[in-house]
Amino acid sequence: MSAPDDLSALWTHEWTRADWTRRNTLDALARGGLAALLGGGGLALSGRAVHAAEDDTVRIGYLPITDATALLVAHAKGFFEEAGLKVAEPTPVRSWSALVEGFAAGKFNLAHLLKPIPVWMRYNNKFPVKVLAWAHTNGSGIVVGGKSGIEDFKGLAGKRVAVPYWYSMHNVVLQYALRESGVVPVIRGDAGPNECALQILAPPEMPAALAAGKIDGYIVAEPFNALGELRAGARMLRFTGDIWKNHPCCVVVAHESQIAARPEWAGKAVDAIVRAQAYCVKNREEVARLISKEGRGYLPMPADVVIKATTDYGPAYEASGAIRHRDWAAQRIDFQPWPYPSATKLIVEAMGNTVVEGDAGFLKGLDPDFVARDLVDDRFVRASLRRYPEWPGAADDAALTRQETLSL
């Protein structure tokens, strides 16, 4: 097992010079909203964001996690250029708060965000964000200390677990699992005997915090679960894709003004991402090496960690109980760009039952059906799916609906 300092050192990488994480950013986002964060500029786009909406160059912001794989592969393989777009080198940031800030301020005009974040941005902060496609499915898990004795979610009673962001699929799925197990999630102070204390922690800090005993577990996107398993003595408790079948996690977002002003630009960007996702499905290990430290260096993580994070979903996990729904035929991470309305509706409903810091009053009375229509602009991905026959059933409208499945 690596020492906590060694785990942190994995993130000492040249790209950190572009990391604008600030400790108070998350609090500003949660308590004051985007208007407060951007200097009280009201609900209008900042000048920089307006400039981004007028910029033909694709400017990608991303967290160095496997959630960003499709965007990174589209860049690495030249799919944006082949679609007729100019693209800048993708910019990595260290935390969700930094990515939200960069997108809101106009530093990026294309990004991946955890699906609950654009819900919060659009309906709490009135920020004109639109979802263009899903970035991937599954791709997350909850890990605990290998010698913790924690065998299920009931075992998290009295424990402390880190989540990457209050408005995240991780927080939604974790709190669902805790409630189903009779454990009460709390977000302030220590956990009581029948409670699990949740705290925000940037993904790069999670494995080291677990190794140091500062937390009892964490739920996050890959490759931090794989890193925890390989370097921090962690054990996979459960994959999120084994709780919510093929759930969305990150989605591809753009500014509504960019889409309105340049619909052809949006369509070409989605074409590139759909092509990239098809490539990822067919070339999992190659893609893992490509985005790793030994490849293009999009992720400052060794190839063995990224390969495990994208391909290791086998019998050992069934034996340990991390996989309990083998019949779902899921993958550790998978790629499917269509934004099923049923999933958006369920996310909005689940957010209403999820404890977060700050004012979540905007969720009261928020109609899930309206959100599914208003937040998502699916015309581009619908056209892209039909343009690329690699996607089975893409030409059949019946394949564009599904029933959501949750089971602990």
Regions found by a protein language model. Name each.
Residues 11, 344-408:
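Conserved C-terminal helix/tail region of periplasmic/extracytoplasmic solute-binding proteins
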Residues 5-10, 51-201, 206-222, 226-240, ...:
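Short, glycine-/small- and polar/acidic-enriched structural segments
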Residues 260-362:
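Secondary-structure end/capping motifs
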Residues 18, 78, 106, 213, ...:
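Short glycine-centered helix-capping/turn motifs at secondary-structure transition points
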Residues 40-44, 185, 281-287:
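Surface-exposed helix-capping loop/turn segments at secondary-structure junctions
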Residues 115-117, 192, 205-305:
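Pocket-lining segment of extracytoplasmic ligand-binding domains
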Residues 18, 24-46:
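N-terminal export signals
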Residues 1-27:
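N-terminal secretory signal peptides
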